[in-house]
């Protein structure tokens, strides 16, 4: 029997204490606070951080009474940044705020200063967004991305529940998976390499770090069937990672857009998600495109699917919709495109209604800002709901 041809593909993740992810979470916590009191809030909130300082800035038009400084400190504290030696002290760091109103030029073009009906609301900006799905995992997400993301989440879990008390908030993960290409569908064979770099305190040895990471992080996350004697482990390969968080590196909202999406699979239009209200199609367009791609794969029409949608500022209807099933479709892609167009409304105002995207509060968007926006469980992730598709099945 001929040996199966394989290839390697790698995805990375960072956990919630990474400086860029800290910024994503603060930006989305601000969005949550605005939407909780005023669902029509227009929010474009950026965050940056460096040693002993967090700044939030951008354009926000809202009736909500928002205490920006409290949101910053609460978010940092929730992640675990409670003293300078872990990278940031939530209660004593400088918090700078520079927020202005949304430009009236943008407001009149997008929502007519709140006068337009939902179906008339224009895209908040130009751009193109992608949604992707694959049948290789129950989440309809790439395995390399799922494992890297879950390792990051598990690192945080064992830090917060004190299983590994030497852990500090900052950390990164990376997983290389060996795949077989089955006529366009991706079939994971094994995990080739696992890389974890995590911030730690002064007391722990590198041997203890490696042993704890294998036992408490890798074992519970990566299914046994994917690990073998040839799997390579790089556990804190730099040898020392005591200084971390904003003390180690500056952080900025929107710097982790591949981690937020599909781990390098599919494609990305370049627009970040966090800190943006749903009239920003960077966010809402990517969410509806994911629902469309996932619904196609979950319905069995294709094993793998990417959907692209594009917009012009102020125009409700998308400029283009594109579908590619990588040769895995049971019917031609042009027919699948028609199914997508018939079953999904890509106008921003209608996406907002159909996915209930004005609902903030209860940390809804904050939850999305670490460990990925897609392949997640829970009622808040409305774009992960598989939509039953109306289509004429070909007769056998």
Swiss-Prot record:
<dbReference type="InterPro" id="IPR002133">
    <property type="entry name" value="S-AdoMet_synthetase"/>
</dbReference>
<protein>
    <recommendedName>
        <fullName>S-adenosylmethionine synthase 4</fullName>
        <ecNumber>2.5.1.6</ecNumber>
    </recommendedName>
</protein>
<feature type="binding site">
    <location>
        <position position="249"/>
    </location>
    <ligand>
        <name>L-methionine</name>
    </ligand>
</feature>
<dbReference type="Pfam" id="PF02773">
    <property type="entry name" value="S-AdoMet_synt_C"/>
</dbReference>
<dbReference type="InterPro" id="IPR022636">
    <property type="entry name" value="S-AdoMet_synthetase_sfam"/>
</dbReference>
<keyword id="KW-0963">Cytoplasm</keyword>
<dbReference type="GO" id="GO:0006556">
    <property type="term" value="P:S-adenosylmethionine biosynthetic process"/>
</dbReference>
<feature type="binding site">
    <location>
        <position position="276"/>
    </location>
    <ligand>
        <name>ATP</name>
    </ligand>
</feature>
<feature type="binding site">
    <location>
        <position position="12"/>
    </location>
    <ligand>
        <name>Mg(2+)</name>
    </ligand>
</feature>
<feature type="binding site" description="in other chain">
    <location>
        <begin position="238"/>
        <end position="241"/>
    </location>
    <ligand>
        <name>ATP</name>
    </ligand>
</feature>
<feature type="binding site" description="in other chain">
    <location>
        <begin position="255"/>
        <end position="256"/>
    </location>
    <ligand>
        <name>ATP</name>
    </ligand>
</feature>
<keyword id="KW-0479">Metal-binding</keyword>
<feature type="binding site" description="in other chain">
    <location>
        <position position="59"/>
    </location>
    <ligand>
        <name>L-methionine</name>
    </ligand>
</feature>
<feature type="binding site" description="in other chain">
    <location>
        <position position="102"/>
    </location>
    <ligand>
        <name>L-methionine</name>
    </ligand>
</feature>
<keyword id="KW-0067">ATP-binding</keyword>
<dbReference type="InterPro" id="IPR022630">
    <property type="entry name" value="S-AdoMet_synt_C"/>
</dbReference>
<dbReference type="InterPro" id="IPR022631">
    <property type="entry name" value="ADOMET_SYNTHASE_CS"/>
</dbReference>
<comment type="similarity">
    <text>Belongs to the AdoMet synthase family.</text>
</comment>
<comment type="pathway">
    <text>Amino-acid biosynthesis; S-adenosyl-L-methionine biosynthesis; S-adenosyl-L-methionine from L-methionine: step 1/1.</text>
</comment>
<dbReference type="InterPro" id="IPR022629">
    <property type="entry name" value="S-AdoMet_synt_central"/>
</dbReference>
<feature type="binding site" description="in other chain">
    <location>
        <position position="18"/>
    </location>
    <ligand>
        <name>ATP</name>
    </ligand>
</feature>
<dbReference type="GO" id="GO:0004478">
    <property type="term" value="F:methionine adenosyltransferase activity"/>
</dbReference>
<feature type="binding site" description="in other chain">
    <location>
        <begin position="170"/>
        <end position="172"/>
    </location>
    <ligand>
        <name>ATP</name>
    </ligand>
</feature>
<dbReference type="GO" id="GO:0046872">
    <property type="term" value="F:metal ion binding"/>
</dbReference>
<dbReference type="GO" id="GO:0005737">
    <property type="term" value="C:cytoplasm"/>
</dbReference>
<keyword id="KW-0170">Cobalt</keyword>
<keyword id="KW-0554">One-carbon metabolism</keyword>
<keyword id="KW-0547">Nucleotide-binding</keyword>
<feature type="binding site">
    <location>
        <position position="272"/>
    </location>
    <ligand>
        <name>ATP</name>
    </ligand>
</feature>
<keyword id="KW-0460">Magnesium</keyword>
<dbReference type="Pfam" id="PF02772">
    <property type="entry name" value="S-AdoMet_synt_M"/>
</dbReference>
<dbReference type="Pfam" id="PF00438">
    <property type="entry name" value="S-AdoMet_synt_N"/>
</dbReference>
<comment type="function">
    <text>Catalyzes the formation of S-adenosylmethionine from methionine and ATP. The reaction comprises two steps that are both catalyzed by the same enzyme: formation of S-adenosylmethionine (AdoMet) and triphosphate, and subsequent hydrolysis of the triphosphate.</text>
</comment>
<feature type="binding site">
    <location>
        <position position="280"/>
    </location>
    <ligand>
        <name>ATP</name>
    </ligand>
</feature>
<dbReference type="InterPro" id="IPR022628">
    <property type="entry name" value="S-AdoMet_synt_N"/>
</dbReference>
<feature type="binding site">
    <location>
        <position position="46"/>
    </location>
    <ligand>
        <name>K(+)</name>
    </ligand>
</feature>
<dbReference type="GO" id="GO:0005524">
    <property type="term" value="F:ATP binding"/>
</dbReference>
<keyword id="KW-0630">Potassium</keyword>
<keyword id="KW-0808">Transferase</keyword>
<feature type="binding site" description="in other chain">
    <location>
        <position position="249"/>
    </location>
    <ligand>
        <name>ATP</name>
    </ligand>
</feature>
<feature type="binding site" description="in other chain">
    <location>
        <position position="280"/>
    </location>
    <ligand>
        <name>L-methionine</name>
    </ligand>
</feature>
<dbReference type="GO" id="GO:0006730">
    <property type="term" value="P:one-carbon metabolic process"/>
</dbReference>
